[in-house]
Each structure stands twice: as C-alpha cells, then as structure tokens.
Amino acid sequence: MQAIHNDKSLLSPFSELNTDNRTQREESGSTFKEQKGGEFSKLLKQSISELNNTQEQSDKALADMATGQIKDLHQAAIAIGKAETSMKLMLEVRNKAISAYKELLRTQI
C-alpha cells in the first residue's frame, strides 16, 4: 500500500493554487499589513472624543434654543439629530463588543 503523505502528485494542484493566489494578492496590492498594538484603543478613544464633541454641540444648541439666542433653528436641529444618531451608533457598538466578549467567555478551551 502506497503512503499518501509521500505522494507529491496529490499536493501539486493545491500548491499551484496557493502560488497563484499569492501572486494575485501581491499584484493587486491587497496584502495584509501588520498593525501595531494599540491601534484599536486609539480608534476607540478618537470615536469617544468625537461623540463627546457632538454631544457638547447638541447641548449648546439646546441651551441656545431655550434662551432664545439661536439664530438658525435648522442647524440646531441637525446638531441634535447628529448627536442622537452618534449616541445610538456608539451604544450598538458597545452592545456588540459586550456580546462578543461574553461569547469569548463561553468558549471552552
């Protein structure tokens, strides 16, 4: 009986596919780049900072509306809507992250 692991003819079609795929990725420039640790934390901090800025703009627009100092009601409504949408998005991202974390905790090793 012939040993399968010594038969290179079985592996040749797969090795050709692998090299073709590698050259296509290199030609198209879609290779994966290594990212430094902490990129996610920087992105998260930046997103939270932007959310905070939109919330502050919304609060200022609401305060201006309450005191009658608003000049453009349309811009105030846009700022409030933008802050509301940003907060909903951030809450959904948080919920998905918590869900993924809980799923990892349930994973058996």
From Swiss-Prot:
It comes from the Bacteria. InterPro entries: FliE. It holds the Pfam family FliE. One of its GO terms (molecular function) is cytoskeletal motor activity. One of its GO terms (cellular component) is bacterial-type flagellum basal body. Residues 1-38 are annotated as: Disordered. GO terms for biological process: bacterial-type flagellum-dependent cell motility. Keywords: Bacterial flagellum. Residues 22-38 have a biased composition (Basic and acidic residues). It is found in: Bacterial flagellum basal body. Belongs to the FliE family. This is Flagellar hook-basal body complex protein FliE. It comes from Helicobacter acinonychis (strain Sheeba).
